[in-house]
């Protein structure tokens, strides 16, 4: 069980309440987020930064930048409120952590829209081979 929690923390460098983000990604992609995206490419996972290796990795880069713009909430730990309407994720308009929800919704949607770029060989892409980007956001 402890190993699963550690893996959950690795997810996307994850931030966004972990269970809520996991649920969104699972809904949009039908993939197990921790195993599928936790160490994907150069930008998914802890301390991820660099030139994206593909569209899926670009989703993580955008997500990292999105979290960098969040104010007033701790993306890793603060809950937010959302609902599902007609298959879409709708973040509660007046919730103080709505911005975190929108970041998580965007990455889940991006993963779904980039399923055709997802490659198993990038799951454990060596971060040492990632090219730094001067202005990642």
Swiss-Prot record:
GO molecular function annotations of the record: calcium ion binding; calcium-dependent phospholipase A2 activity; phospholipid binding; toxin activity
Give the matching CDD domains: PLA2c (cd00125)
Tell me the keywords, alphabetical order. Answer: Blood coagulation cascade inhibiting toxin, Disulfide bond, Hemostasis impairing toxin, Myotoxin, Secreted, Signal, Toxin
List the cysteine pairs that form cystine: 42-130, 44-60, 59-110, 65-137, 66-103, 73-97, 91-101
| Family matches, as InterPro entries | PLipase_A2, PLipase_A2_Asp_AS, PLipase_A2_dom, PLipase_A2_dom_sf, PLipase_A2_His_AS
Give the main localization category: secreted
Q: Which Pfam families match?
A: Phospholip_A2_1
GO term, biological process aspect, one: negative regulation of T cell proliferation
Instruction: Note the Gene3D superfamilies from the entry.
Output: Phospholipase A2 domain (1.20.90.10)
Leader sequence residues: 1-16
Q: In which tissues is it expressed?
A: Expressed by the venom gland.
* Annotated Gene Ontology cellular component terms: extracellular region
Q: Which domain of life is it from?
A: Eukaryota
Q: Where in the cell is it found?
A: Secreted
Query: SUPFAM superfamilies, alphabetically?
Result: Phospholipase A2, PLA2
Concerning its family, UniProt says: Belongs to the phospholipase A2 family. Group II subfamily. N49 sub-subfamily.
PANTHER family documented for this protein: PHOSPHOLIPASE A2 FAMILY MEMBER, PHOSPHOLIPASE A2, MEMBRANE ASSOCIATED
Function noted in UniProt? Snake venom phospholipase A2 homolog that induces local edema a few hours after injection (5-10 ug) in the hind paw and shows weak anticoagulant and myotoxic activities.
Q: What is this protein called?
A: Basic phospholipase A2 homolog Ts-R6
Supply the source organism for this entry. Trimeresurus stejnegeri
